[in-house]
Amino acid sequence: MREILADLVAEQQGLDQSLQRAPDRDWRQRVATGGVTVQDTIAILAWGEQHSARLVTGKVSIDDLLADYGDLTTFEKGGIAEAKGKRPQEIIEWWRFARADVVDALSRMKPGQKVRWLDGKIAARTFATIRLADTWAHGLKILTSLNKEIVDTPRLRHISWLGWATLPHAFDAAGEDFDDVRVELGGPGYARWVFGDDDAENVIRGPAGDWCRLVVEHSDDPGELTATGEVAELALAVAGIYR
């Protein structure tokens, strides 16, 4: 768990630092999607971490959360409502404490230890990867809205894997039949990340940044990604971690 948790913390700290000394007008700035502000987005992250800590420690079940909120949009509205009347510094402190609770709980687990999730149980390592992807996805919205530089990091490897690993679920959600897809990506610093069987007939190739933006649904533009095979072409249309 050490590697994924270190990268999760680094991703969170990077976004945190980008908001240090941000003027109030930045916090009121609307992000590109969802009709919410930067302040709302950090509140959504804090809300997500708060409930993630409760999930990991068994204080609440995913069934309880689904019964209370029903869907992701309603859940996020709960976070925005919780932050109403709070100052930006209060919200970012809320996020800091909540995310620390998640990391602490996950650090006590083995990588393969199971956490109850939407479609059953997932490994603790995968749960941490989802938290990293969520932080990065919301960070993209914030940094884009504030016209801040976005630098792709080697941490995209985790999100790249998650995008590939969730392809079967994305196909199922779209009502499509899935066949093996190999994903070959170029990461920062000339890294090469490959997921899937060597003999797969369907292959997606391109920059890791484009793939990650696609699977967190920050963009429906495949960018420089290319697809070989009908299933790979369909994967570019339906891929999404949150589907």
Residue ranges with predicted function:
Residues 174-210:
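Glycine/small-residue-rich hydrophobic helix-like segments
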Residues 2-35, 40-43:
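Basic, Lys/Arg-rich alpha-helical nucleic-acid-recognition elements, primarily the DNA-binding modules
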